[in-house]
Amino acid sequence: ILVNWGGGFPTPEIVGNVDNQNLHALKDIEYVVVTNPEFVYQAKDLAEFHQKEDGMNVAVVTTDQVYNEFSSGTPDPTAIRAFMKMLWDKASKSEYGVYPQYLLLMGDGTYDNRGILKMNDNNKILTYQSVKSLNETSSFSCDDYFGYVEDGSFGYNNLYTNKRINIGVGRFPVSKAEQAENLVNKVKQYYALGPGEWKTKVLALADDNDEQNSSSGYHSFSTHQEEAITTLE
């Protein structure tokens, strides 16, 4: 044992305050908005709009709140899924429980969750990365991960085979407050326009491979997905 008789105990450094929170108290939430703290104002604006127009119970929470309560303060995409599963499980245990139906992530994402490439403008909300990272056609980021919350609904291969996602998941890929405000306004405009022929038009985009006969499977996969979408009635 080495003892430094001339030293002293370290002095704790005060970093800041942590506000009290209790996300576990939430219940009967139909629409959840998980937002980067930079876009709280826009997220609350959208929540109030849906509450008024659709009569839904909407909750707005920040990524910091989710991480604090579901991953001990460590940024982790699984914390978002754990939060949604908590809401789902709470509804399943109640005779008249309201299940969460929609999850909106307000903030851009990137494959570089650890920030190694210093793409701060893109890394607003962490993404889930597929476990098959060594295969070019099976490696991807997918927000569907956050919507598989029912017991037994998610496993190693479920993102490839399971089509029964429990919660609809969307993302506003915004990096600035102005972008978030623009997308919120687009939602409001969508409601204001009402029904019409414009709602029957779909734009389908698909990537392809430069070498169409390549064994990589890029071309056939992308083309088949595009054709499947365009045949929907």
What are these regions (language model features)?
Residues 1-233:
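Cysteine-dependent hydrolase recognition
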